[in-house]
Amino acid sequence: MIQDYLIIGIFLIASFIFGMVVLLTASLVRPKKPNKEKLSTYECGVETTGSTWIRFKVSYFMYGLVFLLFDVETVFLLPWAVKFKSLGLFALFEMVIFIGILIIGLWYAWKEGALEWK
């Protein structure tokens, strides 16, 4: 069993080293000739007008986080529902605890006003 983890660890270390070598090689080999054209903001092939830096409302981020939370819940809940009969009572209690934690998180987000549009 330790050998399995050793193989995974070696693979992770090797992939990390490979990624660093590729990034380092690319930064050493690339041409370094910055000019105004290369440093300008490019958006869909059209010259930008006005300021390219805009204020981003954090409420979009909070809605995205809550959506991601319940999207992950669906990823765990659907396979569990398919195998519900064969998993037994212990899996039911595990899922009740999981959903309970998510409900507490939703309640906290609601209480903090993360779901209100301001």
Swiss-Prot record:
Entry EC no(s): 7.1.1.-
UniProt key word Cell membrane: yes
Record keywords, A-Z: Cell membrane, Membrane, NAD, Quinone, Translocase, Transmembrane, Transmembrane helix, Transport
Location in the cell: Cell membrane
Transmembrane among keywords: yes
Pfam family for this entry, one: Oxidored_q4
Record-level GO cellular component terms: NADH dehydrogenase complex; plasma membrane
Transmembrane segments: 6-26, 61-81, 87-107
Gene Ontology MF, one: NADH:ubiquinone reductase (non-electrogenic) activity
InterPro entries to which the protein is assigned, alphabetical: NAD(P)H_OxRDtase_bac/plastid (IPR023043), NADH_UbQ/plastoQ_OxRdtase_su3 (IPR000440), NDAH_ubi_oxred_su3_sf (IPR038430)
Top-level EC class: translocase
Major site of localization recorded for this protein: membrane
Membrane topology: Multi-pass membrane protein
Catalytic activity entry: a quinone + NADH + 5 H(+)(in) = a quinol + NAD(+) + 4 H(+)(out)
Function per UniProt: NDH-1 shuttles electrons from NADH, via FMN and iron-sulfur (Fe-S) centers, to quinones in the respiratory chain. The immediate electron acceptor for the enzyme in this species is believed to be a menaquinone. Couples the redox reaction to proton translocation (for every two electrons transferred, four hydrogen ions are translocated across the cytoplasmic membrane), and thus conserves the redox energy in a proton gradient.
Subunit field text: NDH-1 is composed of 14 different subunits. Subunits NuoA, H, J, K, L, M, N constitute the membrane sector of the complex.
Similarity comment text for this entry: Belongs to the complex I subunit 3 family.
The protein, known as: NADH-quinone oxidoreductase subunit A
Species whose genome carries this gene: Clostridium beijerinckii (strain ATCC 51743 / NCIMB 8052) (Clostridium acetobutylicum)
Lineage start: Bacteria, Bacillati, Bacillota, Clostridia, Eubacteriales
The gene coding this protein: nuoA
